[in-house]
Amino acid sequence: MKKFVCFLALAVTTFCADAQFASLDKNEVKLMRESLKKDRKFSKIFRNFQVIADQSLSETPNPIAVILSQGLLAGDPRKTASLKALEDANKVYALAFAYKISGKTAYLNKATDFFTAWAKINKATDDPINQTKLEDMVTAYDLVREDVTAQSRTLTDDWLRGIADALVDSKYAKGSRGTAINNWNSHRIKMIALIAYTLHDNKYDSVISTELEKQLNVNLNPDGTTHDLMERDAFHYQTYDIEPLISTCIAIYRATGKNYFDWKTANGSTIKNCVDYMTPYMTGEKIHPEFVKSTVAFDKKRAENGEKGYAPGTLFEPVNGVHTFSLAAYFDKGYNTIIRRAMHDDNYLNWRMALNAFTVVKP
C-alpha cells in the first residue's frame, strides 16, 4: 500500500490546490474505478480493503499519544500498544479508497473521525522510525483532503505539519550519528516529502531535495549495495532503506518531473542500481544468509527474542523484496517480471502494482 502521485501545477508560492502528490489524482481515481469494474484481477486485489473499510465503519479510533516502537523488542507492552493503535492507519487508508471508489460519504465521515482523533491526541516526535508508521495515514489524507470539512482539514493539517517540522529538525539527522546516513534518514526524508506534498506546503521544497541528494550520496554504493546492507549484512535492511527513498522519488517526480530514481551520485550510484543488485537474490540465482556479519547489537537481541527472520544465517526470502520491486516498477515496469518470478506466479498482482497501473506516468 503505499504512495503514488500526480502531475504538477505550481502557483507562484504554493502547489495547485487540486493537485494530489501522495495518492491518486481525479483522473487516476476515475481510471481506478473503471478498472475495478471491468477487470476481476483488480477488483480481487481491492476486496481486502473493502472488507476493512466496511468493518471500520463501526469501529472507534484508537489514537496513541506517542508512538513507541523503535528500539523495542516484540512483546514489549509499549510497542504492542503502539502497533495496535497504528492499525488505524490501515483502516483509514481503506476507508479513503472505499470513499473514492463508491462516493459514499459514510466512508469519508468515518475516515475524518480517525484523522481528527489522531490529530487531537497524537504528539509529533523527531524519531523517524516511529513516525514512518503513519505513512498510510498521510497517503489516505492526501486522497480525501479536499473533501473533508475546513475545520477537520485545519486540525489534521496542523498535526501533520508538526510531524514534518519535528523531522526536519530531528536530532537523529545531525552530526556524526549513524542515523544521519542510514535507513532512519531515508524514512525521515520520505515522511517530510509526503506530508509536504499532501499539504501543498512549498516551504519544505529545498529541504526535501537537499536532504535526499545528501542521503543518496552517503548511503548508496556504486556496486548496488547500501550503507545499511553493509552494516547489517541483511537484505531486510537494503529493502527497508531504499523503499522510503523510492517513495520519495515517486512523490518528487510526480510533483516536479525530476527523476531521482535514476539520478547519479558523485560516485555514480543510483537507487535503480541498488534495486538491480537484488535481482539475482529475488529470482533465486543467488542466496543470502541474513545478519551473519551484522555489527548492530539490536539485531542479536531480536534474534535472542525469537523474532522471525533475525536469526543469523536465515536465508533472505524473495517475497520480502516484492514491495521494493513493486515500488520500483512505478519507474520501470520490467520489474513486474522479476516480481512474478519471485512469487512463482505469472499472474501475480499486488495493490502497489495495481496502483502503478492506475497511475499516469510522465513520458
Q: Which residues does each predicted region cover?
A:
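Extended amphipathic alpha-helical interaction segments
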Residues: D157-D169, T179-R188, I195-N202, S209-V218
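Short gly/pro-enriched beta-turn/loop segments at secondary-structure junctions
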Residues: H187-K190, Y240
